[in-house]
């Protein structure tokens, strides 16, 4: 009987491991207390600057200034259960785990802070498992756990199955029957990995 290869799991960072949305809202309200804001339960669409810009055009630039500022990514709180889940996943037999994250185009602070966040919260061994890319479709894997609902790039049919991680901006979306969702890190992520393993 042939030995099965390991399951490779790609895990997004912002909105999946690090609480980008809460950090953004808190930072925006702190910096611009007089401006209108979008409560988390009313967030719609992956890009916050687009929703803020629809409220008033100048708000798009203001909200972007929050996540482009030094310290923003470094100081994000972990998503509940994320760190323990990733450590357990990494210890699973025949399972390879990588953190697959897209840096901002305005990357001055973002890139270094993402590395430091991983080292501070998960340890140096996970720094070795960071993949920074603007196009996740070209990264080889079996599963991609990501809060972005529509991931496009050079590859029309990526090697991975996209598991949508529930976040405030996507919780209202109805997925087709062929798509799977992970509601939180308390949800059955182990079952998703094992079902993928069985299909390899």
Swiss-Prot record:
Alphabetical UniProt keywords: Cytoplasm, Hydrolase, Magnesium, Metal-binding, Nucleotide metabolism, Nucleotide-binding, Phosphoprotein
Coiled coil: none
Record-level GO cellular component terms: cytosol; mitochondrion; nucleus
EC main group: hydrolase
SUPFAM superfamilies assigned: HAD-like
List of catalytic residues: 12, 14
Enzyme Commission number(s): 3.1.3.-
Entry cofactors: Mg(2+)
Keyword Metal-binding: yes
Keyword Chloroplast: no
Residue sites binding substrate per the record: 20, 46, 67, 101, 136
Subcellular location: Cytoplasm
Residues with Phosphothreonine modification: 102
GO BP terms, alphabetized: allantoin metabolic process; amide catabolic process; dCMP catabolic process; deoxyribonucleotide catabolic process; dGMP catabolic process; dTMP catabolic process; dUMP catabolic process; IMP catabolic process
Assembly and oligomerization: Homodimer.
Protein name: 5'(3')-deoxyribonucleotidase, cytosolic type
Gene designation per UniProt: Nt5c
């Amino acid at each position: 009987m042939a030995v099965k290869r390991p399951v490779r799991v790609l895990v997004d960072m912002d909105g999946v491991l690090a609480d980008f949305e809460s950090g953004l809202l808190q930072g925006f309200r702190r910096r611009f207390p007089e401006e209108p804001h979008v409560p988390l339960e009313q967030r719609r669409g992956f890009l916050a600057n687009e929703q803020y810009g629809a409220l008033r055009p100048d708000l798009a630039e203001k909200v972007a200034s929050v996540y482009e500022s030094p310290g923003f990514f470094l100081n994000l709180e972990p998503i509940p259960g994320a760190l323990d889940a990733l450590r357990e996943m990494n210890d699973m037999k025949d399972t390879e785990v990588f953190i697959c994250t897209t840096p901002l185009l305005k990357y001055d602070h973002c890139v270094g802070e993402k590395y430091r966040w991983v080292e501070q919260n998960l340890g140096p061994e996970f720094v070795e498992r960071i993949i920074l890319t603007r196009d996740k479709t070209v990264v080889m894997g079996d599963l991609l756990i990501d809060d972005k609902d529509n991931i496009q790039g050079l590859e029309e049919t990526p090697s991975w199955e996209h598991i949508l991680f529930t976040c405030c901006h996507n919780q209202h979306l109805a997925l087709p029957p062929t798509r799977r969702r992970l509601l939180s890190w308390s949800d059955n992520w182990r079952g998703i990995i094992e079902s993928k393993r069985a299909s390899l």
